[in-house]
Every structure is written in structure tokens, then in C-alpha cells.
């Protein structure tokens, strides 16, 4: 039962119809018997400042932040934590005695998903795409000791800007270019991360940017798309005896880290994962 003592968390963005975060977090709260709830807060860009101040005033514990607010919200928070400051975007806010702190758990989620199957330190990484998720992964993996990172994007200029930002903030010299460089780049990569929406529901049969013929045995292939769980890219990885990593892993681990930030407790990983898979299998 929701009462005046119930601790409130949630997610704010626009639109929000696709979010699986309420399912994942509410399953964890129920499993632990916590008087907490996670709800969606649709917030249009023009209402972002008012939303942050309103959540602060209402005593909300924290929220996830999604498109299109991850960068814009920086203007309205008091403190930004760790890697999030380098990335220049946050996906998690914690309200603590009137102070609003920002975190980027996409970054740690990407790292943990990869570390289930490989070591990032000393690895050669190829990232497809140059948007917010690509930024989070690139900065986190550079900080964790990747030997080299190549960023390829449909618009090479955007990849160049990300690489230059990494050089300015980390002193890390990433390579960059357009998709015409994919073939040569995959050959030398230990880890491939596709941050593009190619293959996302309902366009599940779209040809991936990298097919099995370009992959090699042992290549770690992380597709950030999680619906479907087994994308065409991951099926191609299996054909090539590469190592597929589903987007559900990053989704799960970014949620796990946000849960810890808000509650100070370790969530039941298996419960959160089962809740996600039940919904995705139903869809």
C-alpha cells in the first residue's frame, strides 16, 4: 500500500512509453519488502527546470533521467559525480537533504556487462555510433584501461567531436571515422559495441552494420539494443564464434547501480533480470 511514508523514485523523460525501468525496480522493491515505488514522470523539455525543483520539494528520493534530458538537466543540479562530469551527461539523480546530485550509471552498466565475459584493460575497442550511450561507454572504457578505442559514426564529424572531447578531458587519443572503416577496424578489435538502434523492435530484421563475415572468433560483441534480446547482430556473432553480449545486460546493470545510489542496498539481480525478460518475452 502506498502511504505518506512510501519512498518515491522514478524516471523522467519525453516520451516515456517504452521504459522498462519501472518494471525492473518495482520488482526489486517488492522482493526486498521495501516501502518504495518507482513511477514514470513524463517531462517536456520546457518543463525540465520546474520538474527538478518540484521533485526536490516533494522529497522524492531520486530519478533516472532519459531522452532528451541527460545533458540539459546538468544546468539544474548541484553536484555531478565522477565519470558523469567527464561524459557531460547524467542518467540518475539523487535528492539528498535538498541537494541534487547527478550520476551516469550507463557508463558503469556498459563496463559491468563487458566484464562478465572479458577484461577491458588492454583491449582494443570499436564503438559504432557517437551519441549519448557511445559517450558513456567510451569515457568509461578509456578510464578503465582500454589500449585503444575507435569511434565510427554515420556522420564522421560527430565521431571526431567525441574523440576530441576524450583527448581534452582524459588525454586519451581515440581514432574516429565513418562506417567505411568498419571492415578494417573489426579485424583488429577485441570488443565491438554497437550503440546504434539498428535491429531494434519493430525493425528486427534490418541488416546489422557488421556481419559474421567480418567478425572473428573470440570477438566480444555487445549490442545495446535489448528488444529483441537476441538481435540479428548477436546471431551473427554466434555464427562467427564470437561472444555475444545482450543489451539487457547494460540495461540491468545501470539499473542496479541506480538502485544502490538511491537506497544504499544491493538489489536482487536475479529478480530484476527475470522481470525484464518476462516483459520482453511477452512482447
Curated annotation (Swiss-Prot):
Secretion signal, residue range per the UniProt entry: none
Catalytic reactions of this protein: shikimate + NADP(+) = 3-dehydroshikimate + NADPH + H(+)
Listed CDD domains: NAD_bind_Shikimate_DH (cd01065)
Binding residues annotated for NADP(+), in chain numbering: 129-133, 153-158, 224, 247
Entry GO MF terms: NADP binding; shikimate 3-dehydrogenase (NADP+) activity
Keyword terms, alphabetized: Amino-acid biosynthesis, Aromatic amino acid biosynthesis, NADP, Oxidoreductase
Superkingdom per UniProt: Archaea
Record has Amino-acid biosynthesis as a keyword: yes
Residues annotated as catalytic: 70
GO biological process, one term: chorismate biosynthetic process
Residues annotated as binding shikimate: 19-21, 66, 91, 106, 226
Biological or metabolic pathway of the protein: Metabolic intermediate biosynthesis; chorismate biosynthesis; chorismate from D-erythrose 4-phosphate and phosphoenolpyruvate: step 4/7
EC number annotated for this UniProt entry: 1.1.1.25
Oxidoreductase in keyword set: yes
Subunit structure: Homodimer.
NCBIfam families from the UniProt entry: aroE, PRK00258.2-2, PRK00258.3-3
Family: Belongs to the shikimate dehydrogenase family.
Biological role stated in the UniProt entry: Involved in the biosynthesis of the chorismate, which leads to the biosynthesis of aromatic amino acids. Catalyzes the reversible NADPH linked reduction of 3-dehydroshikimate (DHSA) to yield shikimate (SA).
UniProt protein name: Shikimate dehydrogenase (NADP(+))
Source species: Methanothermobacter thermautotrophicus (strain ATCC 29096 / DSM 1053 / JCM 10044 / NBRC 100330 / Delta H)
Source taxonomy: Archaea, Methanobacteriati, Methanobacteriota, Methanomada group, Methanobacteria
